[in-house]
Design a protein with these regions (language model features):
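Conserved alpha-helical scaffold flanking the Walker A/P-loop in AAA+ ATPase domains
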Residues: 44-47, 100-120
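Pre-Walker A (pre-P-loop) alpha-helix and adjacent loop at the N terminus of AAA/AAA+ ATPase modules
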Residues: 17-63, 245
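Walker A/P-loop
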Residues: 49-86
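AAA+/SF3 P-loop NTPase mechanochemical coupling elements
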Residues: 108-117, 146-163, 174-183
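Conserved C-terminal "switch" segment of AAA+ ATPases
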Residues: 13-21, 34-35, 171, 185-257, ...
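C-terminal engagement/docking regions of AAA+ P-loop ATPases
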Residues: 2-13, 252-334
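P-loop (Walker A) phosphate-binding loop of NTP-binding proteins
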Residues: 60, 94, 162
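Conserved AAA+/SF3 P-loop NTPase catalytic/coupling segment centered on the Walker-B
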Residues: 113-140, 154, 169-178, 190-198
Length: 334
């Protein structure tokens, strides 16, 4: 939400955010005991956590995706659960079910793995649509219904779903409407050579660094509310809107060449998440105000899964990343 009060004391706000965001460095240091490299992935996890959003990670197996969210849950003193999505999984295996007790002749409720602060949905595209939608509904509503009872999910609540971009056989691709519910879609890349050398040494070492809880869930909930206090100037809001509108009407921004390549642009959910992700990025960098670089830093992960490409774009091997890059390089920066 924009701050229209012209007399806003940015200095005070900046000091407050600097003080309240100090825990971010502690969290990063703790996670880095287990994770070498993958700075972007860890930053995006923190953005998802602070922005009350969820993250879709795409990458081949073995890139520390599971380890990252597990390490984060340990450092935050939160509960963690992992759901391995398979073709025979049922919605009840995710959200929970009613169990009949023959002795007492009554039903009792068994809560599913979705009742945790940090939920890893591993290979989400391996389960049928009804299972995917059960999880995505829980993500959206922050509550689930088992039988005739509705249960609120634990706060904070972060879902990190993974999918393998290589193996597409026997998978159920997420529909556009479902993918849009993820705040960010992050493509995880291989580590650099020197990072991988450190990974080998760390895994062959007999000394194991255990992750200690350095932040409480209460601190995270306070930080989630503080993110809204990060100041965003009207010029930055206009910049965000220009970027989003450029995905819908590229010809109005002198990008006529993109019109035949884009089948649909980002929805208002894209605008909301871009503004929120920029605020979160400013917060984790200990700043009480948003600058254009914050928007440019997160835009690819916010819009990657929100822009539809035409067959023509696919034939020309044009990716959404290419489209976003062109838009960012063209739209005027305030």
């Amino acid at each position: 939400m924009s701050d229209t009060n012209k007399n806003v004391d940015l200095g005070k706000k900046d000091e407050l955010i600097k003080k309240e965001s100090a825990f971010v460095d502690l969290l990063s240091m703790e996670i880095n005991k287990k994770i070498i490299g993958q700075k972007t992935m860890i930053e995006r996890l923190l953005i998802g956590l602070l922005g009350k959003g969820h993250i879709l990670l795409e990458g081949v197996p073995g890139l520390a995706k599971t380890l990252a969210i597990n390490s984060l849950s340990n450092a935050v003193k939160g509960s963690f659960s992992r759901i391995q999505f398979t073709p025979d999984l049922l919605p009840a295996d995710v959200i929970g079910t009613m169990i009949y007790n023959m002795k007492s002749g009554t039903f009792s409720i068994k809560q599913g793995p979705v009742f945790a602060n940090f939920v890893l949905a591993d290979e989400i595209n391996r389960a049928p649509a009804k299972v995917q939608s059960a999880l995505l509904e829980a993500m959206q509503e922050k509550q689930v219904t088992i039988g005739d009872k509705t249960f609120k999910l634990t706060d904070p609540f972060l879902v990190m779903a993974t999918q393998n971009p290589v193996e597409q056989e026997g998978t159920y691709p997420l529909p556009e409407a479902q993918v849009d519910r993820f705040m960010l879609k992050v493509v995880v890349d291989y580590p650099k050579l020197e990072e991988e050398q450190k990974i080998i040494n760390m895994n062959l070492s007999s000394k194991e660094d255990k992750i200690k809880p350095v932040v409480t869930t209460k601190q995270i909930l306070t930080a989630q509310n503080l993110v809204n206090e990060v100041y965003m100037d009207e010029k930055i809001e206009k910049y965000i809107l220009d970027l989003i509108f450029c995905t819908r009407y590229p010809e109005k921004y002198n990008l006529k060449n993109l019109s035949p390549l884009i089948s649909f642009g980002a929805s208002p959910r894209g605008s909301i998440n871009l503004a929120l992700a920029a605020k979160c990025y400013a917060f984790i960098n200990h700043r009480g105000y948003v600058i254009p670089e914050d928007v440019r830093e997160v835009i690819t992960d916010v819009l990657r899964h929100r822009i539809g490409l035409t067959y023509e774009a696919e034939a020309e091997n044009v990716t959404t990343e290419d489209v976003i890059k062109q838009i960012v390089n063209t739209v005027e920066v305030p």
